[in-house]
Design a protein with these regions (language model features):
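A short glycine-rich, His/Asp/Glu-containing loop-to-beta-strand
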Residues: 32-67, 124
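Bacterial N-terminal signal peptides
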Residues: 12-24
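Ligand-binding loop in jelly-roll beta-barrel domains
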Residues: 92, 106-130
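Short acidic-glycine-tyrosine-enriched beta hairpin
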Residues: 59-60, 89-106
């Protein structure tokens, strides 16, 4: 009997450890994907080969973007939440509601929403036409 109780305890410990690790991995994976982008308008510009987009970006609490670039300039205005913004080559900064920021074309950057509240941004892109709006960083 002692042997089967010991085996049961070991199985329970292994199972609990697996479950805990799986939960952490799942939560981490979900944080990256909890970002909604809605294109509000897309318009050819007076500059040949360029287009402008106005995009609403919504982060779930704690969500973060993967490192990426855009084929043109980005201007953003944070309406709600607190965002941690990292632009390669510059110190990470905190963006608060009512603040705006700029990211130059092809500059690697990423952002993370604070854990407690969602983040909502209004983003204007001035980008090269017919290129993907976002590309993973190399």
């Amino acid at each position: 009997m002692k042997h089967s109780k010991l085996t049961s305890v070991r199985v329970a410990i292994v199972f609990a450890t697996f479950l805990a690790l799986f939960s952490v991995i799942t939560l981490h994976a979900q944080k990256i994907g909890e970002i909604k982008r809605t294109v509000l308008t897309k318009q050819d510009l007076s500059v040949p080969g360029r287009e402008g987009l106005l995009v609403m970006v919504e982060f779930a609490p704690g969500a973060r973007e993967a490192r990426h670039t855009h084929p043109g300039d980005l201007l953003a205005y944070l309406q709600e939440g607190t965002l941690s913004l990292s632009v390669e080559g510059t110190p990470t900064r905190t963006v608060n509601p009512g603040e705006a920021y700029f990211v130059p074309a092809e500059k690697v950057h990423w952002a993370e929403c604070a854990e407690k509240t969602p983040c909502k941004l209004l983003v204007t892109f001035v980008v090269e036409k017919d290129k993907p709006l976002m590309s993973p960083a190399k």
